[in-house]
């Protein structure tokens, strides 16, 4: 079998994965707090006919050697945690992070998760939750007669109570920060969980220890750049076509060999 067939096959597989990643980015262009991914590749092991620096004759040394590549493989999908644009909304419960950090969420099984999606709601128990009903941590309880919710830049939440002149504080939002954001595990529903690669979360007040500030009545939009993704898609398509052409050409070479 001509090695080019296998090499081109690895190229097809790689570009298919690349296209899947691009498609997911484009599918989530309107997802609040979504962070785009990119596929990372590496070349496969080389078949070494002659090592660089080895003797090519008794008196000469090969300056670059003779090594044949065997293809490519994907090694990771890297999440890019660059800032998305802040979009103005009409909801006092929407909160966007401008800078680093994640909101803390408690899952139904008690485990912790983290999100950049600050489109919050208040559940029937008067608690601040995500759109999926997951509790924001630490738990923030709103009085039944509270109104005019206000969120300060550093996360302090206040409401107004009838017949009281001053707003009352009902809680505070804290942000989790990680040494390696890309090491977080995506679990869907705009949520991440920590891993050994991400390191443990560092919990801080917004605006301190490298975390961003909060903006009420805003949501962070997806950081997907449609034009960039379309360019990447065209490049992936062309690479796929080229590898397909290699397979076709190698097949034609095999056919000619079989006639000899």
From Swiss-Prot:
The keyword Signal does not apply. PROSITE patterns: FLAGELLA_BB_ROD (PS00588). InterPro entries: Flag_bb_rod_N, Flagellar_basal_body_rod_CS, Flagellar_FlgE/F/G, Flg_bb/hook_C_dom, FlgE/F/G-like, FlgG_G_neg, LlgE_F_G-like_D1. It is found in: Bacterial flagellum basal body. Its main location: other. GO terms for cellular component: bacterial-type flagellum basal body, distal rod. GO terms for biological process: bacterial-type flagellum-dependent swarming motility. It comes from the Bacteria. Residues 52-71 are annotated as: Disordered. Pfam families: Flg_bb_rod (PF00460), Flg_bbr_C (PF06429), LlgE_F_G_D1 (PF22692). Belongs to the flagella basal body rod proteins family. NCBIfam families: FlgEFG_subfam, flgG_G_neg. The basal body constitutes a major portion of the flagellar organelle and consists of four rings (L,P,S, and M) mounted on a central rod. The rod consists of about 26 subunits of FlgG in the distal portion, and FlgB, FlgC and FlgF are thought to build up the proximal portion of the rod with about 6 subunits each. PANTHER family: FLAGELLAR BASAL-BODY ROD PROTEIN FLGG (PTHR30435:SF19), FLAGELLAR PROTEIN (PTHR30435). This is Flagellar basal-body rod protein FlgG.
């Amino acid at each position: 079998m001509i090695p080019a067939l296998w090499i081109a096959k690895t190229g097809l597989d790689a570009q298919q994965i690349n296209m899947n990643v691009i498609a997911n980015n484009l599918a989530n262009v309107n997802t609040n707090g979504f962070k785009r991914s990119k596929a990372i590749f590496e070349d496969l092991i080389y078949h070494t006919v002659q090592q660089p620096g080895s003797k090519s004759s008794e008196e000469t040394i090969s300056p670059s050697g003779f090594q044949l590549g065997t293809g490519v493989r994907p090694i990771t999908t890297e999440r890019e945690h660059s800032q998305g644009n802040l979009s103005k909304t009409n909801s006092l419960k929407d909160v966007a992070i401008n800078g680093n950090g994640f909101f803390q969420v408690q899952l139904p099984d008690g485990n912790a998760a983290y999100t950049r999606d600050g489109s919050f709601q208040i559940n029937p128990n008067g608690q601040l939750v995500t759109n999926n009903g997951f509790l924001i941590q630490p738990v923030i309880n709103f009085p039944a007669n509270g109104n005019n919710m206000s969120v300060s830049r550093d996360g302090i939440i206040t409401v107004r109570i009838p017949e009281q002149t001053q707003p009352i504080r009902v809680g505070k939002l804290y942000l989790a920060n990680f040494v390696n954001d890309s090491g977080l595990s995506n679990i869907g529903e705009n949520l991440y969980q920590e891993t050994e690669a991400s390191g443990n979360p560092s919990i801080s007040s917004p605006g301190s220890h490298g975390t961003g500030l909060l903006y009420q009545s805003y949501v962070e939009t997806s950081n997907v750049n449609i034009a960039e993704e379309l360019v990447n898609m065209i490049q992936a398509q062309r690479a796929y076509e080229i590898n397909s052409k290699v397979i076709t050409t190698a097949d034609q070479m095999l056919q000619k060999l079989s006639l000899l």
